Structure formats: structure tokens, C-alpha cells
């Protein structure tokens, strides 16, 4: 049962790390990155649809994103959705595809994005700590129900802490990497 709690904890923490990776990928650095558009939802035939489901998104050059809709009629809807997003970019529509030129980031904007990355990682750490607390609560309940001894409880809690420390370190590494990426000119 203890091992099941540890395994369950690792699975939940892995999901948190994967969600953090997705969040950090969507924070724009100085280069064009198709993941910047992942959160954009386009009104397509009356229903909100993620942009990556209705168009091929590529970065043919370091500062250009190219969006080629699978259905040409979606071009104006995609352009409208990009303009309404908080990306701060102006799409250019040539009738077949949309190009976005990603402007250089100002020092001030870089610092803002770094703060966003830090907040995102802090939120992930809170989730990890909550998972640690839940695992420890389950272990304490097992000890209270005489399923494990006090020594086993202490050993299991130490293992929970080691797992948590490992994932917190991953969060810190991912954040540090993203901050370097953002601050790179």
C-alpha cells in the first residue's frame, strides 16, 4: 500500500511537470515558436476549435511563424483569433496562409515574461506540495488504522519528501532554463 501511494504520488507529480512544460512553452521567448499559438481558439463553423486542429503551424525562420489552414475558409477566423489574443503580434494574411513576424522583445517585456514564468513555476510547486501533503495524510491514516508501524510511517514520509524534492528541483531547472531563454537577446 505504501508503494502504491509513492507510485501514485510520482504519477501526479509527473502530470504537474508536464503541465508546467506546456505552460512554459506557451510563454514567448525572443524566437518564433509554434507553441506560442497553442492556447489560441478559433471560431470554426460555429464552435471554438484549437488553432492547431485546423491549421499547420511552422516556424520557417527564427522570427516568423507560418500558419497554413487545412480549410482556406478558416483564414479570416484564424487571423481574427490571433488579433484578439494577448500575444501582441500582427498577422499578415496573403490569402493562402498567415505569417506572424515575431518582434524582438524589449528588456521590460522580457522581465515581465520572466515574472510570468516564475509565477507559473510557483503555482506548480504549490500543486506538488499539496500532493505531498495528501500522500502524507494517507500514510498517517494507514498508521492510525494500524496498517503500518510508526517506523514505517517515518520511512514512507521520508520517501515522499525525497520524491517531492526531486520534482521541485525539476521545476526549478525548467524555470531557470526558460528564464535564460527569455533573457537571451
Swiss-Prot record:
Protein name as annotated: Ribosome-recycling factor
GO biological process, one term: translational termination
Localization per record: Cytoplasm
Primary location: cytoplasm
Function: Responsible for the release of ribosomes from messenger RNA at the termination of protein biosynthesis. May increase the efficiency of translation by recycling ribosomes from one round of translation to another.
UniProt key word Ubl conjugation: no
HAMAP family in UniProt: RRF
This protein's UniProt keywords: Cytoplasm, Protein biosynthesis
Family indicated by similarity: Belongs to the RRF family.
One GO molecular-function entry: ribosomal large subunit binding
UniProt keyword Protein biosynthesis, yes or no: yes
Amino acid at each position: 500500500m505504501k508503494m502504491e501511494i509513492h507510485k501514485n504520488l510520482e504519477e501526479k507529480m509527473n502530470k504537474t511537470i508536464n503541465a508546467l512544460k506546456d505552460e512554459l512553452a506557451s510563454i514567448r521567448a525572443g524566437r518564433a515558436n509554434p507553441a506560442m499559438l497553442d492556447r489560441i481558439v478559433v471560431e470554426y463553423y460555429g464552435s471554438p476549435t484549437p488553432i492547431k486542429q485546423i491549421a499547420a503551424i511552422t516556424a520557417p525562420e527564427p522570427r516568423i511563424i507560418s500558419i497554413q489552414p487545412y480549410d482556406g475558409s478558416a483564414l479570416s477566423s484564424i487571423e481574427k483569433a490571433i488579433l484578439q489574443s494577448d500575444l501582441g503580434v500582427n498577422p499578415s494574411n496573403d490569402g493562402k496562409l498567415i505569417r506572424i513576424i515575431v518582434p524582438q522583445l524589449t528588456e521590460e517585456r522580457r522581465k515581465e515574461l520572466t515574472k510570468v514564468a516564475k509565477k507559473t513555476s510557483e503555482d506548480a510547486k504549490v500543486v506538488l506540495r499539496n500532493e505531498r501533503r495528501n500522500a502524507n495524510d494517507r500514510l498517517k491514516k494507514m498508521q492510525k488504522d494500524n496498517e503500518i508501524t510508526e517506523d514505517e510511517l517515518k520511512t514512507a514520509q521520508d520517501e515522499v519528501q525525497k520524491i517531492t524534492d526531486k520534482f521541485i528541483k525539476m521545476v526549478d531547472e525548467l524555470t531557470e532554463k526558460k528564464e535564460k531563454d527569455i533573457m537571451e537577446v
